[in-house]
């Protein structure tokens, strides 16, 4: 990839947002983070993924940004993992696609359990491949989450899940329906940590109200105008958890990188695609 390729990349504007995020400087990366070898990319935490596993060439952000694709969310997720004391915790990832967050969870907790739900069978296959690549196991379900599909309360009952250490949801505008379908688990505080990607401002604040109305403590709320990752982000914790709010960087607090800075960053990389 040269400068012209970068400037004409279909995801260039997204890449500029991500690379401009000051949160990048706060994420600890292993030495080989972003390295491509034999069609695999090393993520910031050492996980391996297939280099085109996430929206094809959007995956270029993996090597451009040292194995990080959503700095704000990944930073908070990493610190939430560090706060989990249960040696055998459980994660439910809704909209799992390439299953990165579930893999990061299993990397931290080898005795844990991961349940992954994805509506697109082709996307789900990417997550299954990545899980197998890293030697992890998960319970994969292909299905739609929402009022007319899978409901968290019913899913947990069917799978025998008594409590969730993490509920992670990125389901493309069905997040409020997801919360309604998790009402029992949430009201009984059987979900310790909730991560929600939001896809409109209206949904963001509706989800935020639901979370607060159910007496969860807010860890971070980043609406779509403040996000470097395109989606809004809500992270909340049960009152049973030692609450730790995070003050992450927000878009608009500083200027985005210029084209010249983007090109300089590209040239500074040991570009694995040349």
Spans of features found by a protein language model:
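Conserved S-adenosyl-L-methionine
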Residues: 95-98, 168-172
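Glycine-rich phosphate-binding loop signature in dinucleotide/nucleotide-binding domains
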Residues: 83-87, 156-164, 188
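A short acidic, amphipathic alpha-helical/loop segment
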Residues: 104, 154-155, 178-185, 206-210
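S-adenosyl-L-methionine
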Residues: 1-117, 120-161, 218, ...
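Short acidic, Gly/Ser-rich segments with clustered Asp/Glu that frequently serve as metal-coordination loops
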Residues: 172-178
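Short, conserved loop/helix-junction motifs that constitute active-site signature segments
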Residues: 108-109, 184-191
């Amino acid at each position: 990839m040269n400068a012209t390729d970068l400037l004409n990349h279909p995801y260039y504007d997204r890449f500029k947002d991500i690379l401009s995020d000051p949160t990048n400087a706060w994420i600890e990366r292993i030495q080989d983070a972003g390295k491509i070898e034999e069609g695999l990319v090393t993520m910031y935490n050492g996980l391996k993924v297939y280099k085109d596993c996430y929206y094809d060439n959007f995956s270029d952000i993996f090597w451009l940004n040292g194995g990080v694709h959503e700095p704000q969310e990944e930073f908070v997720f990493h610190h939430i993992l560090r706060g989990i004391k249960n040696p055998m915790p459980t994660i439910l990832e809704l909209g799992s696609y390439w299953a990165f967050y579930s893999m990061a969870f299993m990397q931290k907790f080898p005795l844990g359990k991961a349940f992954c739900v994805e509506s697109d069978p082709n996307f789900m296959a990417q997550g299954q491949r990545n899980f197998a690549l890293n030697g992890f196991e998960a319970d994969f379900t292909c299905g739609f989450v929402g009022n007319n599909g899978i409901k968290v309360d019913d899913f947990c009952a069917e799978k025998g899940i008594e409590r969730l250490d993490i509920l992670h949801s990125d389901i493309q505008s069905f997040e409020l329906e997801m919360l309604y379908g998790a009402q029992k688990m949430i009201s009984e505080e059987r979900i310790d940590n909730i991560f929600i990607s939001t896809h409109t401002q209206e949904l963001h604040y509706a989800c935020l109200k639901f979370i607060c109305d159910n007496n969860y403590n807010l860890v971070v709320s980043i609406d779509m105008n403040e996000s470097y990752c395109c989606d809004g982000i809500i992270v909340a914790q049960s009152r049973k958890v030692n609450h730790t709010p995070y003050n992450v960087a927000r878009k608009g607090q500083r200027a985005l990188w210029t084209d010249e800075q983007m090109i300089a960053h590209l040239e500074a990389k040991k570009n694995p695609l040349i």
